[in-house]
Every structure is written in C-alpha cells, then in structure tokens.
Amino acid sequence: MLKDVTLGQFFPGQTPIHKLDPRTKLVLVIVYIVALFLAKWFVSYAAIAAFLALVIAMSQIRLKVVLKNLKPLLFIIILTALLNLFYGQGEPIAQFWIFKITKSGIQNAVFMVLRISLLVAGTFMLTYTTSPIALTDGLESLLSPLKKLRAPVHELSMMMSIALRFIPTLIEETDKIMSAQKARGADFESGNLLNRAKALVPILVPLFISAFRRADELATAMECRCYHGGEGRTKLSELHYQRRDYFAYLSGTALLAVMIVLRHFGL
C-alpha cells in the first residue's frame, strides 16, 4: 500500500508540461481546483477529465502511476460515497433500517467519487512534473508581494518544498521498517482495524528517530553550504515566462470559462 503513494516524487522529462514555468503550473493547479468545484453534472466532470487526460498525455506520465495514488485513499473515497449515498434527499428507491437510498444520493455519491479522484490525480501532476527546487522558486515568486509585509516568503517556500521532498523518503523508510518487523514475526495484515493499528505502534519510534536523524543531516548539509535563509541570496537562473506559459494560461482561462457556462446551464 505504501509503495502506491507517489506524492512528492518528481519524474524528470523534457515534455511541454515539464518545461512550463513553475509559477504557471501552480496557478493552473488553483484554476483546476476551482473549475473542479464548479462542476455540477456529468458533462462538467467529463470536460475536466478530458483536460486532465490531455495534461497526462502531454507530460508522458503513465496513467498507471497516476491511478496508483487513488489506492491508499480508497477507504476515504468509499466512506465519502456511502455518506452521500445514504443521506440524499428525495423519494427513497430502497431502504434498509434507517438508511435510505435516493436518486439524488446516488448522484451525489458518484459526483463525490469523481471529484476526489480528479482532485488527487490533477494536483499530483504538479509534483510529478516539477522539481523541488523549481517548486520553491515558483512559490517564492508568487508569494513575493508578501515580503512587503515582512513575511518569510523564502523560508515558507523552502519548508513546503522540503516537506514534499521528504514524503517519498519517509514512505520508503516506513516500508523498510515494516519489512524488518515482518522478518521478526510481526503481523500487520490480520485482525480487525484496532489490532492492525496497535501493530503499527512499534514502527513509530524507529520512524521518528530516522526522520529526526535525516532532518539533522539536512540541516548540517545546509549549514556547510552557508545557507542562512533567503536574505541576500541570488539565483543561478531567473524565472522567465515563455510563449508556452501564456498558451497554458489561455488554456486554463478557457477551462474556467467553459465550467462557468456549463454550471450556468446546469450541465
């Protein structure tokens, strides 16, 4: 299950999506999320799915890799779908005890599954096609107006970038610890949910120790390279918008406009 989590991983490439300015991709992710929450009916979700499919195809990321992210969230997706299924309004189609299934409940459950799936797949494309360094530069550039309010923009961007970068590392470390515990007779897959949760307790201590050790090593490495925050720092290469970035902004604006029109007509 842990191996299916690919959040924070970067897949290098030279595709049009990889070459986009990180600021462009950050803004487009926000536009994508807004467009997704504007979706009201199957036509709207189909339009967003088509847009996402185009992005995935252009980035040359395998669809299997994108879909793997949904597996760890399967329990949450099913639970959310059931909550929407049994608490819909209208005439019941079927009823069991206090639970009733309505037409609106079925629609809401399907839409919620689509919304979560498209949201996860779409937002993960940002880390797949953007390196941690580029992501930090993009965030810092977009948040630069906050520097006038004396906000630590560079430090915040660096923290977010490091957090994303360490997610795959911690997942890999957890998998190694679990494999070592299994070799000693530990069982993480049998029993009820409470027993499985108790079986995970012995993993936490070595995982925290490993995380603190890696954090200390990273801090030492940054100090050795004379890193003292963003004040007075210069960049090897500055961010500049290219023609493809303006085309991407135009595509995002078009998607948002289409979603507004579809929502207006109830589609």
Show where each model-derived region lies.
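Transmembrane helix-loop junctions in multipass membrane proteins, especially transporters and channels
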Residues: 41, 45, 60-64, 88-96, ...
